[in-house]
Amino acid sequence: MASKESKQMITGKSFEYSLLVQFEEKLKKQTNVQVIKNSSFQIAKECFESVSVLEQSEYSLSASFAVNFLMDIEPRLSNDIGKDDILQLEILSDDKGKKGDVRDVLAIRLLQKWEIGVSAKNNHHAVKHSRLSSSIDFGEKWFGIKVSKNYFDKV
């Protein structure tokens, strides 16, 4: 039997894969899409393929709703500025999260110098709790501006 941690990893990676697939399926009809098939992609795909068909369907449905919402509020996902404006989709490594970047799936338009990231949480306690900590300077990591000593003293 899989441990709780490994089951959470499998479900989390499965949902990340579902999000990326839904982005690709919905957006390839409207713009040029390129999926970055790195090691994180391969791991997520293997996790997705290891769960039941019912779980795959549930993840895909949830991901579909999320992607539809994001497409409604973020026009750059589906609107390119020409045939060379490729939307790259990537699953980030967990190492990024350890360094303060909590995004799991990234959509990038290099030509527009634009990106949007999604922190994929599926029935997970992290939805209720931020990933801020007393040791990671999220201001420096996210914005290039250090948080105050007062912040760290209070956290």
Predicted regions span which residues?
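Acidic-basic catalytic patches of nuclease active cores, encompassing PD-(D/E)XK
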Residues: 1-95
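Generic signature of intrinsically disordered, low-complexity, basic-rich segments
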Residues: 62, 113-115, 130-131, 151
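Acidic, metal/cofactor-coordinating or nucleic-acid-engaging core segments within structured domains
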Residues: 127-155
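Short loop/turn segments at secondary-structure transitions that flank enzyme active sites
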Residues: 111, 122-127
